[in-house]
């Protein structure tokens, strides 16, 4: 599982960025259109819609296995998936988008009000490439779990 920062485990740095949020919002709207047009699935910003997002991720992984696209070719898909996940979380659980710095690398990610950092684009990319080992529904459920329930 991708590491999550907590106050007790300072792995990285976070810098809020409104532009990253606007980009993620746009990609999440693209995801809603993509789900509707390609799969006939309605995404409604609810936690329950994550089941449908995982179904779409299954299909994208199958396409990936058959065609082996380049990282640049899958980028729009993992950005849509990850942005939708992040936007559900942001809207329902008080998080913000910005830049995460980890081991000197900087990439778009999120911070929950409690200080936990996570990067839904990276998880969505892993799901497309690796398959069910990186299940997005389980990832989202993990993010939503109360802190006292986490390992």
Spell out what each predicted region is.
Residues 109-151:
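A recognition module on extended beta-rich or small alphabeta surfaces enriched in W/G with H and D/E
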